[in-house]
Regions:
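Hydrophobic anchor at the beta1->P-loop junction of P-loop NTPases
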Residues: 37
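NTP-dependent small-molecule kinase module
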Residues: 2-28, 51-53, 171-239
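A glycine- and Lys/Arg-enriched "phosphate-lid" helix/loop adjacent to the NTP-binding pocket
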Residues: 127-199
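Conserved lysine of the Walker
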Residues: 45
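ATP-dependent small-molecule kinase phosphotransfer cores
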Residues: 59-156
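Hydrophobic positions on the alpha1 helix immediately C-terminal to the Walker A/P-loop
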Residues: 48
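Walker A (P-loop) phosphate-binding loop of P-loop NTPases
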Residues: 42
Length: 239
């Protein structure tokens, strides 16, 4: 099965496709682990993922760093559409485009990597869809949540074993996010939208306390990185 991941020990921020530290010379004997990162805008996911990947590499653990929406060539094309501020689509269309991207990403990238013994580190996954589309767009509407859950059950064959929810007050996250470059289609939403998104993540953490671990995203990047690494070590028994 084709995968767009290119084995490498060096993360290239400008690349739109997954970055992998997996070796071409040896296949791991066991299935890889699947970790997702979640959170509202400006919580520091990108830096936290970079730090985790450095720790995995230092421990000789092969990993593939990827993202959603995106992660495969086709999914990246859909990402461009979804994040373009000029895109004007209905909520249902947005939801279906997200799952189209996710299906391709999973089949072309995530599953092959896991089957090869590579750890997959994904910037956003299904929880973001529930939080952003189910709560940010639909204010927690049960019918919309049911629709999303149905799509997950139908098309998502592998959920993360561990989800790291980086939690920060919405106002603080938005203050950080506003210092970045031009906002994309989601980042341009109002504070109320992200307050609902935060509510969604909080509810998901209550629903799935074993899988979703809340990480305090305040403080220095070193502090946050240490909290994340301790959680990963405890979950996967890394010495």
């Amino acid at each position: 099965m084709h995968t767009s991941a290119t084995p490498s020990h060096t993360n290239t921020p400008s690349s739109n496709l997954p970055e992998s530290s997996a070796s071409n010379t040896e296949t791991a004997p066991t299935l890889g682990r699947f970790i997702s990162f979640e959170g509202t805008e400006g919580v520091g996911k990108t830096t936290a993922i970079e730090q985790l990947c450095l720790r995995l590499e230092a421990n000789g653990i092969p990993y593939l760093r990827t993202r959603e929406p995106g992660g495969s060539p086709f999914a990246e094309q859909l990402r461009d559409i979804l994040l373009d501020p000029a895109t004007d689509i209905e909520d249902d269309t947005e939801l279906l485009l997200l799952f189209a991207a996710r299906c391709d990403h999973m089949q072309q990238v995530i599953l092959p990597a896991l089957q090869n013994g590579t750890w997959v580190i994904c910037d956003r996954f299904t929880d973001s869809t529930i939080a952003y589309q189910g709560f940010g767009r639909a204010y927690g509407d049960e019918l919309v949540r049911g629709k999303i859950d149905m799509l997950i059950k139908q098309f998502v064959t592998q959920l993360p074993e561990l989800t790291l929810w980086l939690d920060l007050p919405v106002a603080e996250g938005m203050k950080r996010a506003n210092k970045r470059s031009a906002a994309d289609r989601f980042e341009q939403q109002a504070t109320e939208f992200f307050t609902w998104v935060h509510t969604g993540f909080s509810q998901l953490a209550s629903e799935y306390p074993e899988r979703i671990q809340r990480i305090d995203a305040s403080g220095s990047t070193d502090d946050v990185s240490a909290r994340i690494w301790q959680t990963v070590m405890d979950r996967f028994d890394i010495k």
